[in-house]
Design a protein with these regions (language model features):
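Intrinsically disordered, low-complexity cytosolic tails and juxtamembrane linkers
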Residues: 18-53
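Short, solvent-exposed loop/turn segments at secondary-structure junctions
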Residues: 180-182, 218-221
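Hydrophobic membrane-insertion alpha-helices, especially the h-region
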Residues: 50-69
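Functionally critical loop-and-helix segments that line ligand-binding/catalytic clefts
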Residues: 2-4, 8-16, 20-29, 76-92, ...
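Short, compositionally biased "basic patch" segments
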Residues: 39, 63-76, 103
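Structural recognition of alpha->loop->beta junctions
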Residues: 159-172, 177, 224-247
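Aromatic-lined carbohydrate-recognition surfaces of secreted/lumenal glycan-active proteins
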Residues: 206-220
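Substrate-binding cleft of extracellular glycoside hydrolase catalytic domains
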Residues: 72-74, 79-97, 112-199, 203-208
Length: 290
């Protein structure tokens, strides 16, 4: 049995048989749903735009990361007009090199890792050294310096492997020790003396002073102020070398990809020469005044 109560304001409420209020039934509840205001619509649109921008930025960063990882771009890459001569360093990890095609890849030279310490010779150096003439590029040989080994003995190993360097680029020696090598290596003076012995032995045999390739840490610790007679091949992967470094070569990336290799996808160390092509050609042995 339904009853109605009426208050002083003439507001009636229907009660059920137990005396509880009965909620009124709406004919079409959708008519009573709150309608979106223009301000709310603008807020939703703004949120949608922000989300789309955020997604776009994430996709862009992922694509940029892939390009950097693959070596297709590098944020520190020097401009071609400023540094027209650029070249990679290769070793046996590249597998066979197709030298006849190698030179047509916007590179002007190449260095080949030849030896390390007193007895190690790169397993593909002899073939690469001979076949590299097919590229038509100036080619140089690189020795990896062992901080704990005798400098003269290292020079003998390098010179024996490289042989006659007439028509080749000035030879180079790399001193870029890792953390463990720096911890367990001899003192700075002994390392400097061994490196000096290497430099002098190569100069005496070849007639030119070798280039020293070094990391920034090695430069500060072993090279700076001690080897002013040597050209410097400086590694700086995130910015151009500091003004106080008198560099000749600058290694700007270790992730460059080139073709003409048996093992595709190999990432290479890439460097530039500080000056123009005419000056660079003077680094070919036989064209340098002794």
């Amino acid at each position: 049995m339904k009853r109605s109560l009426q208050n002083k304001r003439q507001y009636s409420v229907e009660l059920d048989e137990e005396g509880y209020p009965i909620e009124p039934q709406l004919e079409d509840e959708s008519e009573y749903e709150p309608q979106e205001t223009p301000r709310k619509k603008k807020s939703l649109l703004r949120k949608l735009i922000i989300r789309l921008i955020a997604v776009g930025l994430v996709v862009l960063l992922i694509e940029l990361g892939i390009l950097l990882w693959s070596g297709q771009i590098w944020f520190n890459e020097p401009k071609k007009k400023d540094f027209p001569v650029r070249f990679p360093v290769i070793d046996s990890d590249c597998g066979e090199v197709y030298w006849s095609k190698f030179g047509g890849q916007n590179i002007q030279a190449c260095y080949i890792r030849a030896t390390k310490s007193t007895n190690h010779v790169d397993e593909r150096f002899e073939k690469n050294w001979a076949d590299s003439r097919k590229s038509g590029l100036p080619i140089g040989a690189l020795h990896i310096f062992d901080l704990s080994a005798d400098g003269k003995a290292q020079a003998e190993n390098f010179l024996s492997a490289a042989g006659d360097m007439t028509g080749r680029l000035v030879p180079a020696v790399e001193i870029s020790p890792n953390i463990l090598e720096r911890i367990f290596s001899p003192g700075v003076n002994e390392i400097g003396a061994n490196l000096r012995d290497f430099v002098n032995a190569v100069k005496e045999k070849v007639g030119v002073t070798p280039i020293i390739k070094c990391s920034s840490a090695a430069y500060d610790k072993y090279i700076k102020g001690e080897f002013s007679d040597c050209m410097i091949w400086y590694e700086s992967l995130y910015s151009q070398p500091d003004n106080d470094v008198d560099w000749t070569f600058w290694e700007y990336t270790s992730r460059m990809q080139l073709e003409s290799f048996e093992k595709q996808g190999r990432r290479l160390h890439m460097s530039v020469y500080r000056y123009g092509e005419d000056e660079f050609n003077k680094l070919i042995i036989g064209k340098i005044p002794n």
